[in-house]
């Protein structure tokens, strides 16, 4: 049976965020790209976290309600990132998606650099 790999179907231009980005800008990026999550990268394209649309919206609602300053992405991002390699099986990834909550998995090389 032919093995279908992640690299054959990954998005080569995923929506990304930086840790310094303000939450409002991240929310606009989610709206423009119609994505539900994306990796937070450093200046070397290394993944340092993950940001979900639901985390951004929940924070914005809370800060608006309490009339507080909205924080930056670094305060919201998840530091433990579930990721895949380009050579991973799409079938195995699909099984993981049924078992785990995330539906977006960054594709990383061996050095943690974002590929898709």
Language-model segment annotations:
Residues 1-13, 52-102, 114:
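Tandem CBS (Bateman) regulatory domains
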Residues 16, 20, 46, 66-67:
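A generic helix-loop boundary/linker signal
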Residues 16-34, 41, 83-101, 107-110:
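The conserved cystathionine-beta-synthase
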Residues 37-39, 50:
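Short, conserved beta-strand segments within well-ordered enzyme catalytic domains
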Residues 43-44, 55:
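Residues at secondary-structure transition points
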Residues 48-49, 116:
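Conserved glycine-centered beta-strand/turn positions repeated across beta-sheet architectures
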